[in-house]
Regions:
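Terminus-proximal functional modules
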Residues: 4, 18-152
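Sec-dependent N-terminal signal peptides
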Residues: 4-14
Length: 152
């Protein structure tokens, strides 16, 4: 009987022990697709190669501490990045579905390459800044693909 109780207690203890947290590395790939009429905009798939630590460029504000962030833009700027040309949604004839299909093929190629390198597509988020009315004619469709990889 003692062995049965001890076995049950041991199994329960192992069942409720917390598992060690898994640590991941994240990478963001951004597509910027122009929705400017007449094909005048620029569309790109961007992936940073350089790393930055946000803490190096962060200041804390409070009622006691009123310092401001004096980081230089040149220190923040990432110069090492991959830039893949995408096609604009519009050309002189209006919306161009072939361009959208082309962009889909290029973005799919990037996603497949990342997955083959061991990354998992964790999140996708999109936003649009569109034409604000007569005379504006500007806009972008931006999508962020957030990948994660288990640290070894």
């Amino acid at each position: 009987m003692k062995k049965v109780i001890l076995s049950i207690f041991t199994l329960m203890a192992f069942g409720i022990m917390p598992l060690s947290a898994q640590a991941y590395t994240y990478k963001v790939v951004t597509s910027v697709e122009s929705i400017v009429p007449n094909g005048l905009g620029r569309s790109r798939l961007i992936s940073a190669n350089d790393k930055r630590n946000y803490k190096d460029f962060t200041s804390t504000q409070s009622s006691v501490q009123k310092g401001r962030n004096k980081s230089k833009r040149s220190d923040l700027r990432v110069k090492g990045f991959d830039e893949t040309k995408l096609l604009n949604f519009y050309n002189l004839g209006g919306i161009r579905f072939q361009n959208i299909a082309t962009n889909d093929a290029l973005i799919t190629s990037k996603i497949n390459a990342m997955i083959s390198e061991g990354w998992d597509l964790a999140f996708v988020t999109s936003a649009v800044e569109s034409d604000a009315g007569k005379g504006d004619g500007k806009g972008i469709f931006i999508t962020r693909y957030i990948f994660k990889k288990l640290n070894n």
